[in-house]
Each structure stands twice: as structure tokens, then as C-alpha cells.
Amino acid sequence: MGLGDKLPSVDADAFVAPSASVVGDVSVGAGSSVWYGAVLRGDVNSIRIGCNTNIQDGTVVHVAKHNVKGSLLPTIVGDNVTVGHKAMLHACTIEDGALVGMGATIMDGAVVKSGSMVAAGSLVTSGTEVASGQLWGGSPAKLMRELTAEEKAFLNVSAEEYTALAQGHKTEADKSFETLLADMDEQEYLTTRDEAYDISLGVINTSGKKEHADLV
């Protein structure tokens, strides 16, 4: 949805769920996905979502005009990022290949560096920097440990899987009204009882009379 002279820019290969809200100065890159109930509100500043990044269901992404020093505070999310369900990103930067867990909050001016992970439910306070390759958690979030090799590999797998998953949802969401009606007709046909099948079960005889009404 546009807001004044600010219009969202969504790549043709991206998926934005029908119930998601993308408002104002927001760009969404190729292969990225914005899931059901998510809100991206670029009103007083801009939101940039890179490529192959997933913003999962119920997440809120917002911005701030500037901090007390006058520095602009957009929200920038890089490539191959996973943002879990119901996370909150506010005027922050999430670099390439990072993961923000479900229900986590990232506040103004915070930076989650590339290849790092924020645990579910954590609060990353304003101005905090989460270093690459680290796991942070808690409220306020603090360094917990370095990521294992398996966890580092999972960061890429998570983004890849969501990019693939989104394509099926995009195919359905992009269907025309006529195609949806045709799908409904086909589904109705597939759920109709076949007389020959009923005869083979002995539910009806060849005259069409039902023999075992309790089986229908």
C-alpha cells in the first residue's frame, strides 16, 4: 500500500502473503517472502529487505525517523536472513545470513552481524552489536557462546528452505479468480462418490438402489 508519495517495491519473484501489510517506502528483493500477518511499515523512514530473506508470520518491521543525535534510522535486512514468527525489528540492521528467533525484539540502532543468531524471545537493546558467528540470548540479550559448525550451516539451510516453501504459497496466491473457480470445480468433482465404486463395494445394486445406507 502506498503512503503519500511512498510506494512499496516488491520483486516479481518475491512472495507477499495476502494478509501481510507492506506500507510506504519498503523494498523486498527477489526470492524473499513476507508471511501471513506480517507488517512492514515504512512511513517515517525506509525498510529494505534483501534477496532470499524470510519475514515470518506475525512479524512487525518498523523504523524511526532519527535518533537523538539526528542519525537516520531505517531498517535494513540483508540477503538470506531468517526472521522468526512474531519477531519485532525496529530501526535496526540485520546483516546477510543472520537469524532472528521467534518473538525476539531488535531495537533502534542495533546491528545483528552476518552469520549470527539471536535466540527466540530475546531483547537486543538499542545500539547493541551482535558479532558474526555468535549466539546471543536473554533480555537484555548477551553473548551466550560461539555458534557451532552445525548451527552456522543451518543459517543457510533455513533461508533456502523458506525460499523454496514460499514458491508454493506464491503459486496459489497469484492464481486468478477464474483459476480458483476451476480449482473449486475440480475439487468438487474429486469428492463426488463414483457409482461404479459404490457398486463394487455393494453399497448399491446395479438398479441404483442403495443396499447399505449405513455405509454411505
Pin down the residues of each PLM region.
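Short proline/glycine- and basic residue-enriched helix-capping loop/turn segments at helix->loop/beta transitions
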Residues: 82
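Extended, small-residue-rich solenoid/repeat segments and analogous flexible loops
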Residues: 1-31, 202-216
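Glycine-rich hexapeptide-repeat left-handed beta-helix
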Residues: 1-5, 9, 43, 51, ...
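A positional/architectural concept
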Residues: 10, 14-55, 59-65
